[in-house]
Amino acid sequence: MSESSSVPTEREQLLNRLATLAYRRGDFTLASGRKSEHYVNCKPVSLSGSGLALISRAMLTHVEADARAVAGLTLGADPLVSGVAMAAADQSRELDALIVRKEAKGHGTGAWLEGPLPAPGTLITVLEDVVTTGGSSLKAVRQLRDAGYKVTRVVTIVDREEGGDAAMAADNLELISLYKLSEIAAFVPA
């Protein structure tokens, strides 16, 4: 807890939720195909009202001031983009939420993007729940850039510290994480 008070800060509250509800030790295969003894599934936190509120306020502080939308790859980013857009509205800031599909819609317009689409050239911040190698985030970034949007930043809840930052930098992206995996793992009793 913070030294000045016995009441945990929002950052400490969120760290506690992630450590107790999202983090597991064991033998896991990640979405990247890699094996790991650490697993982080943020959905038990991001799909709870109070957890999403904590995440959204924290992520909003890292969305570029001139961004007009936040976007992310479905499914992990779905609650994040909606929550951050709502947190922005609470501060009288217009910020739309976009969902990037994993593949083009098979019917209707065949759209990759869902939501109120801004004008081409608009700055969009990409949101992610967990970054490992950066593959999911980069897929979202490429779809947005192909649609004519400017993307320079990815904000994630957790950076697993497995090369995602280097992959982002190679694509001229800044990666900002609310937490590093090492910070969450250190918070959990052995």
Swiss-Prot record:
NCBIfam families hit by this protein: pyrE (TIGR00336)
Assembly and oligomerization: Homodimer.
Top-level lineage group: Bacteria
Pathway of action: Pyrimidine metabolism; UMP biosynthesis via de novo pathway; UMP from orotate: step 1/2
Keywords on record: Glycosyltransferase, Magnesium, Pyrimidine biosynthesis, Transferase
Name used for this protein in its record: Orotate phosphoribosyltransferase
Binding residues for 5-phospho-alpha-D-ribose 1-diphosphate: 101-102, 105, 107, 128-136
A biological-process GO annotation: pyrimidine nucleobase biosynthetic process
Enzyme Commission identifier(s): 2.4.2.10
Gene Ontology molecular-function annotations: magnesium ion binding; orotate phosphoribosyltransferase activity
